Amino acid sequence: MLYYINKILSNNKVQAVILGIIGLGIVIVLTSYNIDDPSFNSVTTEYHSNLVGIFGSYLSDCLYQFFGLAAFIIPLACFVWGRNCWYGRYRGSFIRMFVMLLALVSSSTLLSKIKLEFIPANAGGAIGIIASNFFERFTNQLYLLLIFFTFIILVVLFEIKFTSLSNFIIKLGNFLIYRIQSFLHNVFSRLSSIRLFPTKNNDKINITSSYQKPVSEKVKFPEEARSVPANPIKFFSKPVSPKISQSEIAELPPISLLRDPEKHHVKGASSLELKQKAEELLTVLNDFGVKGQIININQGPVVTQYEFEPAAGTKTSRVVGLSDDIARSLSALSTRIAVIPGKNVLGIELPNKQREFFCLKELIETPEYQDKSTLLPLVLGKDLAGKPLVADLAKMPHLLVAGTTGSGKSVGINVMIVSLLYRYTPEECRFIMIDPKMLELSAYDGIPHLLTPVVTEPSKAVVALKWAVKEMENRYRMMSNIGVKNIAGYNAKILEAVKENRIIERSIQTGFDPETGKPIYETVTMKMEKLPYIVVIVDEMADLMLVAGKDIEMLIQRLAQMARAAGIHIIMATQRPSVDVITGVIKANFPSRISFKVTSKIDSRTILGEQGSEQLLGMGDMLFMGSTSKISRVHGPFVNEAEIEQITEYLKESGTPEYISAVTEQPEEDDSGIDIGDGTSDEVLYKKAVQIVRDERKSSISYIQRSLRIGYNKAANLVEKMEKEGIVSPPNHTGKREILLPER
């Protein structure tokens, strides 16, 4: 019987109800107090008027005698403790008793100088009189009141937690700062009478609940890479009128197109439940012979991380290998164990009972996304502590994404695209989207940010990547002509020249005079136009590698190694992170990677270099490895198809796309040195094969196959055709053929 009673009383809800009943009873006792009721100080034959009876009469008299009006702190403390017990915010009994005594003494001392007729002694009771007389020996009454008033404030702050108050103050301060900045932007934009550049609000997004057009202001660029050119540059004072295309009239989409966050928040586990889970975890580890202690618990929106400090001599690999056994013993979906960088502990991550889902709008409104120092913000989600995580694609500078079906990879790609669309207009950022599956990125077809319609054919994808390489080389020549090192410095130079109403010309040596031998110079006039960022998005890398693996790998390698300074960045995704898709060359040039849930430890090692991705929960749960090789767990937001459709429809209505036909047009004579069989006709291949046989004097099928980078069967057909046309002889008894064409 005692066991069941003890079990019932140990429940948080039962304790909360008991504390609430006690607090309510004391309130009734104090409010129904009558000075004429029987008590220890008075004996009367009259009937008591206290609502709780004779016990209430004696109790109320004692409370008023000792504490005065400060006795109402006792039921208030019961209500506060009951609320904490109900929500699992447990505090030690010693701390709670100390807080209540401090509040009673402070309040009684403050009320000790007040005289009231309906209660005995004074408003502070005997405790107040004693404390007041004691402290008056050391200071006057004014300082006494201030000191005890401060004590009461500290008590209140202790109960409502310092972190809650500080978070409220920080949020209020950020809100006021944003409002002041928005007001100043409005004032300065109206005072600006000369607009030398298309007015776009790209530094900060003024987000409101209802849509407002972006405030017109001058374009600002990061002040970096302002290097002095090595060669002389000539500036001429001529009128300059920047070219304004139709896509520049497009506006940033309003934040109201995104779904509002849900008001109902998932209730997290209580402190007592977390401690019980930690004890169970230690018991499981002890059963497997692993000794140690848990020094900290970090509860997040999806998982809870237990910081486990193993005993001396315990190998990390031994603990990491117990992840499946721990998940089985604790009846958890999965368990991930990894070393926490900078600490002497292991992070054991267990999923919460209830998972918290959050939308993209909640993260778009955060200061991390609106920070203007982030050039290409990619919203990734929330970390283990629930803090927003926004990465900068310009610093990565390329991103590799992997994950199986249902892991949240496609939603993550959409979140990244939308986060860029909410920051930049078409004149500032352009996209090349390659979608061999013809499903994931088709919703963005027709938006003004695209350089070409969404590419779905592998042959055109290779051509688009070739165009990106040529654009990169062209941008490097343009930046070299004016002596800057990156796209930010180039745009800053152009903006400065436009503001001063000048054009930039430079003399470039083109050769030597055959008669005099003196160098010949040609004057080149620079285009007074900004260079936009170009983001190449490849949704499924595996399909492209099957069709033209060598060509794709070579182009991706070239872009990944050199395109950062030119403002060209790549986001590449795949469902199958195997070594034939993510080759060593690609991994070496993509230091920043994201891994959603994968099927095996081998796939996790392929994408991240270590296991752990197979233990993820799916639905946006990911591991992010930045350029510093530090891996962190992130929970991605959710954006549905309706939100994407609303955003794309708004962008289509606000501006028309200006496609560049050369992005996907296959040139007749490709001098880039990269050829593919899928995008080249048989007649062109045959002519190239004949040229190789004539020049190299080699006619083997394997040599032609390697030279043209085609399959064995196609190379054999080309050799047989040359045999029919009398270019090569039939094979002899050793399999060799004679070349019948004369040498050049």
Swiss-Prot record:
Binding-site list for ATP: G406, S407, G408, K409, S410, V411
Compartments (UniProt record): Cell inner membrane
Pfam families: FtsK_4TM, FtsK_alpha, FtsK_gamma, FtsK_SpoIIIE
Keywords associated with the record: ATP-binding, Cell cycle, Cell division, Cell inner membrane, Cell membrane, Chromosome partition, DNA-binding, Membrane, Nucleotide-binding, Transmembrane, Transmembrane helix
Ranges for domain FtsK: 386-605
Origin superkingdom: Bacteria
SMART domains found in the cross-reference section: Ftsk_gamma
Intervals, Cytoplasmic compartment: 163-744
PROSITE patterns in alphabetical order: FTSK
Chain ranges passing through the membrane: 15-35, 62-82, 92-112, 116-136, 142-162
Cystine pairs: none
GO molecular function, one term: DNA binding
Main location: membrane
GO BP: cell division; chromosome segregation
Gene Ontology annotations for the cellular component aspect, listed alphabetically: plasma membrane
Family matches, as InterPro entries: FtsK/SpoIIIE/SftA, FtsK_4TM, FtsK_alpha, FtsK_dom, Ftsk_gamma, P-loop_NTPase, WH-like_DNA-bd_sf, WH_DNA-bd_sf
Topology term for the membrane: Multi-pass membrane protein
Family: Belongs to the FtsK/SpoIIIE/SftA family.
Domain notes: Consists of an N-terminal domain, which is sufficient for the localization to the septal ring and is required for cell division, followed by a linker domain, and a C-terminal domain, which forms the translocation motor involved in chromosome segregation. The C-terminal domain can be further subdivided into alpha, beta and gamma subdomains. The alpha and beta subdomains multimerise to produce a hexameric ring, contain the nucleotide binding motif and form the DNA pump.
Subunit structure: Homohexamer. Forms a ring that surrounds DNA.
Protein role: Essential cell division protein that coordinates cell division and chromosome segregation. The N-terminus is involved in assembly of the cell-division machinery. The C-terminus functions as a DNA motor that moves dsDNA in an ATP-dependent manner towards the dif recombination site, which is located within the replication terminus region. Translocation stops specifically at Xer-dif sites, where FtsK interacts with the Xer recombinase, allowing activation of chromosome unlinking by recombination. FtsK orienting polar sequences (KOPS) guide the direction of DNA translocation.
Entry protein name: DNA translocase FtsK
Organism: Rickettsia conorii (strain ATCC VR-613 / Malish 7)
